[in-house]
Amino acid sequence: MAHLTAILLGNELVQIIIGPELKEFFVHKTLIRSTCDFFDRAFNGRFKEGIENKMHLPEDDAEVFEIFVNWMYSGHLKGGLREPMLIIYIWIFAQKCQAITLKNCAMNALQDALDNEIIGPFSLSNSEVTHIYEHTAWGDELRVFAIAMLAWEITFGDPEDVANLESTFDDVNGSLEDVLEFIRDFGGMPVADPRVRGGRYDKCAFHEHSTHDELVCVAALNSHRYRNIH
């Protein structure tokens, strides 16, 4: 980020140890505390982590955390993220840490990865929908996106993907009911493609925003995929 100067960052670092492989990361304490409430609370001076400037996150993934660190310093997700499951992992990590802007950037990246202009659009796989349902709650933006994606697949999806769709509804408890309710909420109108931002789905349709957010969505500003649905 252009505004990250040595004065603003300070010179105090914290050590974060990730995953069973114990990969170490050293980041500026001021920056990571300003990124999300989870790390702000953890590195508050009253707690052990704040006193020792050290934290162990044994259940998190080192690749995902490295992407988080890169995003934290640069202000955008690294280019070339094309694996939907990896992006789903990033979203879930951001949800855990309540890094709202990272969540929104990950959602943009997921839409773009599934709507790849070079090698063609993709649907969510059975394993991806299963993982989303296992790690989200009702109303979470990522689950709503998965439901919207399945709803679109029912009407407009590739006939060759029917087996994947049926297996998803069989394996993911409650997913079919969620999708049918979602379709009913459209009131008879055709379901829109949720991979496309800037038409019947607003650019921020699957973002999280609060009343305290900036007037302009940073994730939307950083997005390059603003296409209209005609």
Describe the function of each predicted region.
Residues 1-31, 59, 63, 70-85, ...:
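N-terminal BTB/POZ boundary and linker segment
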Residues 24, 49-56, 91:
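Short interface patches used for recognition in eukaryotic signaling and trafficking proteins
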Residues 28-40:
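Short helix-loop-helix/strand-helix junction enriched in hydrophobic and basic residues
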Residues 36, 99, 169-173:
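Short, solvent-exposed helix-helix connector turns and helix-capping sites enriched
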Residues 37-52:
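Cytochrome P450 catalytic domain signature, combining two hallmark sequence patches
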Residues 55, 156-189:
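Long amphipathic alpha-helical assembly cores
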Residues 56, 63, 67-161:
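Post-BTB helical module
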Residues 174-230:
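C-terminal helix/juxtamembrane-tail motif
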